[in-house]
Amino acid sequence: MELTRRDLVKFGGGACLVASSAALAAPVAAMAEEAAAGHVVRSAEVAFSQEADILIIGTGIAGLAAGMEPALAGKKVIFAEKKGSFGGDSASSCWFMFASGSKPQLDAGLTTTIDQAWEAVAEKQTAGFDQYEWYPEWAKGKYYANTKFVDCAIENFGCQIQEPATADELPRLSASVILPAEGIGTGYTYILSPIQAKLEELGCEFEYEMRAVALIKDAPEGAVIGCRFEDAEGAYVDIKAGAVVLATGGFVDNGEMVTKYLPEWANMGVLVHGSMGEGHRMAAAAGAQVANMDSSFTYCNLMGDIPNATTWGYWAPLVLVLPNGKRFIQEGQSHDAAAAAIEAGYREWWVIFDQQAFDARCIAKSVENNINVHADAYRTADTIADLAVAMDVPADVLTATFEEYDGYVAAGEDAAFGKTSWLKSLSAPFHALKLNAVRYKTSGGLMVGPNNQVLDNDGQEIEGLYACGAVTTLSYASCSTVAATGYFVGETLATK
C-alpha cells in the first residue's frame, strides 16, 4: 500500500523521524522552514511504502518468538532483518535452554509444574525493582512465557527437541534443560527454521538487507508509528505499523559502545558479528531509558570462539589446559573458562576429550560438527605425549597434568579445582580443540513496562514501541529468556 504525505495526516498528523547517531534526519517541517540554512545529506520526507499491524526488527529467536502468537491470531506482521537471512545471533547459539512444566518435560515423567516452579523462584524473580508496582506480575508473565514458548513452538510451529536429559546424562541441571532435537548447537535446524517457515506460511512477510536507521513518531513527543530502513542499494524504506518491536540484539560488535560500557573487553576479539546496538541508540533517540549497560560483567561472559565446546563439560568428562599444559578450571564450569584463562595470563586454551564426548547424545552432533568445521584447531593422538606435540604444549607438563588428574579420579576428589560431575579419566585416542577468548554477547539496555512497551526516562511507556531479547535489560542475553521476552511481547500484541 502506497501512502502519500496527505495520507499521513489521516493517521494523526505529520510524521517525524527520530534522529540517532545511526541516521541524521530532520523533521520535514523544520527542513522546509530552514532550507536556506542548509540541507542534511540524505535526509528525506517520511514516505511510507508498506504497512502492517506489527513491525518486528530482527529475526533472531526473540524476534521470531514475538511473531508467533500474533501470526496465529491473524495479525499482519512484517519482519525486517539487516542481514541476508534470518537467525541473527541465535544462529550461532549453543541452544542451552531452560523451562519448567513444559509438555515434553511432563510427558517424560518430570513432575514439576510451571506453577510449582514459579512458587519456588518467585521471591528471587521479583526482587530488585520495588519502584515498579507492576513488576511482580510482569516478571511472572515473563517466567511463564518461557514454558509457553516451548509448548507453542512444538505444537504449532513444528519444532523438535530431544527427550529431556536424565540425571546420569546431565548431573547438575537435568530436570530443567531443553535441547533441540540433535542436542547442543542444533537450534537453527530444529527451532529457528521451523518457526520462520511457519511464520511465512501464516502470512508474515520477511524483508532482508533492511538496516533500521531511525524510528518514526507521529509527533516529536508522540507515539512510535514506524521505522525508516536503508535497503541493500542504500535507498530509504519507511514502514508503518501499529506496533514496532525492537528485537535488535546486543552491542557486542560495536567497539565504541563496548569501550564505553565494558572497557575490560574492548581489546578482545568478537565472535558474533552484527550486534551493533542500533536498537539501543534508536530507542534512546526516541526518549527511552537505557540502563545497566555494564551488566554483562554479571550476566554474560567471555566465550571460546568455538562456543559449543564451552558447554561440553556439562555432558562428558573433559580436561581443560592452558598453552603451558596445566589445568586452570573445574571443567564442568567451562562457561567461565575464558575469564579464567585471561586471569592466568592467556587468551587461549585447549579442550581435551575422548570417545565419551562422541557418545553423549546431547553433544555428539556438536562434537562431530565442530571437529570437522574447525579442522585447523583440532588435534588427535594415541598418547598424551604425542597429543602434547600436536598441540605445541610442553609434553612433560601435560603428562604430569594428566597423571595428577587421574590421581584425583582414583581418589574420588578433585583437590585442585573441586570438580564433581564427570570426574572421570580419559582414554586413547585423545582429542583436543583449541579455543580463543572472544566477546560473545552483552546484557543491558531497554526496560519495558507492564504492557511490554519501552519505558522512557520518566518510567512511562512509549506508546507503540516494544522490545524483547538482548536489547532489553531483563533478558540477560540468555537463549531461554531472550525467547521468553519475545514470546511475552507476542502474547501482548496478539490481543491488541
Residue ranges of model-derived segments:
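A glycine-rich dinucleotide-binding beta-alpha-beta segment and adjacent secondary-structure elements
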Residues: 397-475
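Glycine-rich loop(s) and the adjacent beta-strand/alpha-helix scaffold that form part
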Residues: 239, 243-303, 488
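Core beta-strand elements of the Rossmann-like FAD/NAD(P) dinucleotide-binding domain
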Residues: 50-52, 234-243
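Conserved redox-cofactor binding core of oxidoreductases
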Residues: 140-235, 255-256, 409-427
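An anion/pyrophosphate-binding glycine-rich loop and adjacent beta-alpha core
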Residues: 280-282, 289-393
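Glycine-rich FAD pyrophosphate-binding loop
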Residues: 73-90
